[in-house]
Curated annotation (Swiss-Prot):
Belongs to the IspG family. [4Fe-4S] cluster binds at C290, C293, C327, E334. This is 4-hydroxy-3-methylbut-2-en-1-yl diphosphate synthase (flavodoxin). Binds 1 [4Fe-4S] cluster. One of its GO terms (biological process) is terpenoid biosynthetic process. Pathway: Isoprenoid biosynthesis; isopentenyl diphosphate biosynthesis via DXP pathway; isopentenyl diphosphate from 1-deoxy-D-xylulose 5-phosphate: step 5/6. Its EC number is 1.17.7.3.
Length: 382
C-alpha cells in the first residue's frame, strides 16, 4: 500500500480485505493475479509470495473446478498474502473457497451460465450469504466483454458504457438490500477513455462505494502501462479509486512488474507527476491482450502476443484493433468488438473478424492467417 502526499479522495465506505482496509481515505492498495495453474500448488504459492513481497495488497487466484478449490485450501496455508478468489461461471464454488480467502470476486455477466433455473438475484444472495458467513469481502466485477446480456440487448451495440453502469448499480442496490456493505465495484474496459467515463458516472451516482480501478486487457508494456496510467491519472486525480491493478501481458516470472507499475503510477499521482497530456491515440493500431492467468491453456500465448505486436508494426497508422486473448473462458466474448481477434486454446488459436469465427489454426500457422486478414482490412480502408 502507498501513502504519500495528501490528495482528495471520495468518501467511500471502508472495505476490509484480510489484513488491509481500502476506502474511507485509506491508502490505495495495488493488487495482481497469479498466472500459474492453480492446481500447481508450489508454483502458485511461489508467485503469490513474490507478488506479496513486492507490495501486493491483494493477490487474486482463479478457481474454476473442485480440484482448483482443493488446491486453494492448501495454498492458503502456505502464503501470508491477502487472497481473493476469481469465480467465473460456477458461482457454487463460493462455498468451497470462501473459508480460505479474504475476498470473492464475481462477474454479473457470468451468472447466466450455470443453474439457469435460478434468477441472478438468487445467485447473488447465495454469494453474499457465503461471503458474509466467512468474513469475506466481495468485488462486483463488471467487464466490457462479458456484460449482463439482458442489459446489452437494451442499448445500441456501440453503447458499452450504459449496460456496464446499469449492471453495477443494480447489483449494488441488491447487495445493499441484503445488509452487506463490505464490497467493492470494478468497471473495466480495454479503452482507457471508457474506463474514465464509466467510473466517473458510477462515482457520481454511488460516491459511497469503493472502486477497484483497472484497464482490462491493457496489453504488453510499455503500451499497457501507458493506457492504464491515462485512466488512473484522470480518475485518482479527482478522488476516484481505492484499489488498482495494472493488467499486463507478461511471462510468469515477471508478474511482479504489475505491482511495480501500479505503485509507480499511484506514487506519481500523489507527487503531482502527471503525464496524461500524452493521450492514447485511438486513430492508430491498437493491440489489446489479456494479462494471463491460470486459465491460459498454452503458455505460447505470451509469445504469440509479442509476435503479433512485432508482425503488425507496418499497420501502425491504421485505426484497427487486434485482440489477443489467452483462454476459452473470456476469449470468445472479449474479442467480439475487435476488428480481428485471436483466442487461444491448448493446441489451436481461434481467429475472428469482429464476432465472425474464421477458423482455428495451429500456433505455427496463425500469424500468416492474421497477416492476410489484416492486409484485407487495410485494403478495404484505402
Amino acid at each position: 500500500m502507498l501513502s504519500f502526499m495528501k490528495i482528495r479522495r471520495n468518501p467511500t465506505r471502508p472495505v476490509t480485505i484480510g489484513s488491509i482496509t481500502i476506502g474511507d481515505g485509506h491508502p490505495i492498495a495495488v493488487q495482481s493475479m497469479t498466472a500459474t495453474k492453480t492446481q500447481n500448488i508450489d508454483a502458485t504459492v511461489e508467485q503469490a509470495e513474490a507478488l506479496h513481497a513486492r507490495g501486493a495488497g491483494v493477490v487474486r487466484i482463479a478457481v474454476d473446478s473442485d480440484k482448483d478449490a482443493e488446491a486453494l485450501a492448501e495454498i492458503r496455508k502456505q502464503t501470508q498474502a491477502n487472497l481473493a478468489v476469481d469465480l467465473q461461471e460456477n458461482f457454487r464454488l463460493a462455498e468451497k473457497v470462501a473459508p480460505h480467502v479474504d475476498k470473492i470476486r464475481y462477474n454479473p455477466g457470468h451468472l447466466y451460465h450455470h443453474a439457469r433455473e435460478l434468477t441472478w438475484q438468487e445467485k447473488v444472495r447465495y454469494l453474499i450469504d457465503t461471503a458474509g458467513s466467512n468474513n469475506c469481502a466481495v468485488r462486483i466485477g463488471v467487464n466490457c466483454g462479458s456484460v449482463d446480456p439482458a442489459k446489452k440487448e437494451k442499448y445500441d451495440h456501440d453503447d458499452s458504457i450504459t449496460p456496464m453502469l446499469e449492471s453495477a448499480l443494480e447489483h449494488c442496490e441488491l447487495v445493499d438490500s441484503l445488509g452487506f456493505h463490505n464490497f467493492v465495484v470494478s468497471l473495466k474496459d480495454s479503452d482507457p477513455s471508457k474506463v474514465v467515463q464509466v467510473n466517473t458516472l458510477f462515482a457520481e451516482k454511488r460516491p459511497d462505494v469503493a472502486l477497484h480501478l483497472g484497464v482490462t486487457e491493457a496489453g504488453m508494456p510499455p503500451d499497457g502501462i501507458i493506457k492504464t496510467r491515462i485512466a488512473f491519472e484522470q480518475l485518482i486525480g479527482k478522488g476516484i479509486g481505492d484499489t488498482v491493478r495494472v493488467s499486463l501481458t507478461l511471462p510468469n516470472p515477471r508478474k511482479p512488474e504489475e505491482i511495480d507499475a501500479g505503485k509507480q503510477i499511484v506514487e506519481d499521482i500523489h507527487a503531482g507527476r502527471v503525464r496524461s497530456v500524452v493521450k492514447f491515440d485511438d486513430s492508430k493500431l491498437n493491440i489489446i491482450s489479456c494479462p494471463s492467468c491460470s486459465r491460459v491453456e498454452n503458455e505460447a500465448f505470451i509469445d504469440l502476443a509479442a509476435k503479433v505486436k512485432e508482425m503488425t508494426t507496418f499497420a501502425q497508422e491504421y485505426s484497427i484493433t487486434i485482440a489477443v486473448m489467452g483462454c476459452r473462458v473470456n476469449g470468445p466474448g472479449e474479442t467480439d468488438d475487435a476488428d480481428l481477434g485471436l483466442w487461444c486454446g491448448p493446441a489451436k488459436v481461434n481467429l475472428k473478424r469482429g464476432p465472425e469465427a474464421l477458423g482455428a489454426f495451429g500456433y505455427d500457422e496463425i500469424l500468416p492467417k492474421l497477416k492476410q486478414e489484416l492486409d484485407d482490412l487495410i485494403a478495404a480502408k484505402q
